[in-house]
Design a protein with these regions (language model features):
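Short acidic, glycine/Ser/Thr-rich loop/turn "cap" segments at secondary-structure junctions
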Residues: 7-17
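Transmembrane alpha-helix boundary signature
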Residues: 1-9, 62-66
C-alpha cells in the first residue's frame, strides 16, 4: 500500500520475485498444513531420503563433478553460487539446514538400531553438504542447531552423549572436507 509500485509489490514480478500474493500463499499453506496435517514418521523418512540425493549432488558439485550437467550453461563468474538441484546456493543451504536439523534431532532422540544408524548417515551427509555448500548462511544454521539442541537433549545422560557424538561427527566431517579440499 505504501509502495510506489503497488502492482509489482502485490504480484512480486520485480526484484526477488516475492510479493504479497506469494506471502499470502505461504501463510495460507502454513495454516492448512497446521490445521489439517498430521505428521507421520514415514513423511519425515521420505523427506530425509529425498534430501540425501540433493545433498549428494551438492557435494559432487563442490568436487566439480557436475553429474547432472546443470552447470554446463552457467556463466563462469556465477559458477560457484549455484549448486545441486536447487540452483541458488542460499536456497540450497536453507534446505540442507532443515535436513541437518531434522536428522540430528532424530538421531539424538532415537532409541538405537537401524533407524538410529539411518539418521546418523543422513546427519553425516547433511553436515558434509552444508560445509561444501560454502554459504554464509550455514554458520547461522549451525549456531542454531548447536545452540538449541542442548536445550532439549541435556535433560538426561543419553542426550548429553548423543550431543557429544553430533559435535564430534561435525568436527570430523570438517577435517575430512578440509583434507579432500587440499588434495
Amino acid at each position: 500500500i505504501q509502495s510506489d509500485y503497488i502492482y509489482e509489490s502485490f504480484w512480486g514480478n520485480e526484484g526477488r520475485f516475492t510479493g504479497l500474493f506469494l506471502l499470502l500463499i505461504y501463510g495460507l499453506s502454513f495454516l492448512i498444513i497446521f490445521r489439517l496435517g498430521h505428521m507421520k514418521t514415514e513423511i519425515l523418512e521420505m523427506f530425509l531420503a529425498a534430501s540425501l540425493f540433493v545433498c549428494i549432488f551438492g557435494i559432487t558439485d563442490y568436487l566439480d563433478l557436475n553429474l547432472l550437467h546443470f552447470k554446463d550453461r552457467i556463466v563462469e563468474e556465477q559458477y560457484t553460487i549455484f549448486t545441486s538441484t536447487f540452483g541458488n546456493i542460499n536456497t540450497y543451504t536453507a534446505f540442507v539446514s532443515l535436513t541437518l536439523g531434522l536428522s540430528s534431532f532424530l538421531f539424538a532422540t532415537d532409541g538405537g538400531g537401524v533407524k538410529c544408524f539411518w539418521h546418523y548417515i543422513c546427519m553425516l551427509v547433511a553436515m558434509a553438504a552444508l560445509i561444501t555448500g560454502q554459504s554464509d548462511n550455514a554458520y547461522l544454521a549451525l549456531m542454531a542447531m548447536f545452540g538449541l539442541l542442548p536445550l532439549y537433549l541435556f535433560r538426561n545422560w543419553k542426550g548429553v552423549k548423543r550431543y557429544s557424538v553430533i559435535v564430534a561427527t561435525f568436527f570430523t566431517v570438517v577435517q575430512i572436507v578440509d583434507w579432500i579440499s587440499q588434495h
